[in-house]
Amino acid sequence: MFPIPWSPLGWTFPKGGNVHAVGKTYEGGVPLAEVVRSGFVEGVHRGSVVALDATGAAVAKAGDVTSPIFPRSSNKPLQTVGMIRAGLRLADSADLALVSASHEGEDFHRARVGGLLARAGLDESALHCPPDLPADEEARAAVLRAGGGPTRIQMNCSGKHTGMLLTCQAAGWPGEGYWRSEHPLQERLRAAVEEFTDEPVAAVGIDGCGAPVLAVSLSGLALAYLRLVQAEPGSPERAVADSMRAHPEIVGGTRADDSRMMRAVPGLLAKVGVEGVIAAAVPGVGAIALKIDDGAGRARMPVLVSALRRLGVTAPALAVFAEVPLLGGGRPVGAIRSLW
């Protein structure tokens, strides 16, 4: 029995609920990646993907790329643009990259978040994101060995939440309730997402960090990333793209997929979102957005590599990401690879 009213056209929530959605829902995708062990296909990951050329025209697509999804953290660069437009000013481009980050909680991430808060006269108690351990396995193990536990700064969205608080200070808005969808900050961020995706937000939910998450289509998400990398130098959107590409390790981490991909492919902007989402763009080439339906992050990179190759990106370093090894007895016995 559904605890919330439902209709074939989408979820509808009563006033005061956590989400409001109107319009069609995501229909699901097609087989995009296969899991091959010892020569035997033991699984398939379905999903949707769209590749746009440098003009914004779709040159390849599969699955449902026009219905709304929650891009999750792939929306962060667009939200950062909204923060800059609302008054956020950060002299260090690495700090700007941190606002767009889903950082893995390594030492340098935690130090940078703490420094931003301290310079603003704040501490982590001002953050609405929940306490967490670092996402990076080595960083998490080090924290636990030292007797530490979950903190808000370690949570992977703490950079975004810090940016939101600093934006409120700059704009003269109250910090209280900055995460609520009706706060003037969130209204500005929603406007930025709608502008760059060229479509209205179809649903507003609550992300894992407690801030609003905005639903748009994969086509809209890809268009937004294309606009980020092809924006005029000096514009807020170009500043966001440039900061992320200049500091890829800040965006994710030493071992994060999007960080590794940006280090490997010149000019590439990439940002993952949980539930199997990633968006990427290369100036003068095009942009990609994809979602793996079952949320498996392991299938993202092989499909992204396939999409980049369809756009003519031939960087030799792509080969490292084209297949994800499967182990048996501690040695490779198969791989996850793209079907698209």
Question: Which stretches of residues belong to each language-model region?
Answer:
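Active-site-adjacent helix/loop patches that line small-molecule binding or acyl-intermediate pockets
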Residues: 19-26, 94-201, 227
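Structured C-terminal helix/loop/strand segments within mature extracytoplasmic catalytic/sensor domains
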Residues: 229-340
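Penicillin-binding protein/beta-lactamase superfamily catalytic region
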Residues: 183, 200-245, 249
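Short active-site loop at a secondary-structure junction
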Residues: 45, 60-78, 95
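Beta-lactamase-like hydrolase cores
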Residues: 19-66
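Short, flexible loop/turn motifs enriched in small residues
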Residues: 41-46, 75, 272-274
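Active-site SXXK
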Residues: 71-88, 108
